């Protein structure tokens, strides 16, 4: 089994792959785009070609990256940020947040505490379509919003 931790961010993600013995196998940073996802999947496949034998810890339960990982067959475990903070305190009690360390902490968390975490299940086609439709108005509104706020005047 291979364990992957992803420190999620809006522009890029820090990633750490850990073996069953807790040894770091690979660290990297991927872009938050389809090429970044392909890069991550290629890195994982070098160490474990069977997606079902890969557990991924990440601090979000949605988004392009999560959907792609679930669809590819990886076991994706969303970890609450507060829980991730506690896992971080276990590994390094003093110190601030570091993306590389956080990626390793998430990988180690799914390695040691996976039994207490809940993996995401793939969405049905209907659920995916509903989620897409629900996001569409927000996406559309953001795309057409003025660059500066418009002041309303009583008149």
Please place each PLM-identified region on the residue numbering.
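Phosphate- and other anionic-substrate recognition elements at nucleic-acid/protein interfaces
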Residues: 1-155
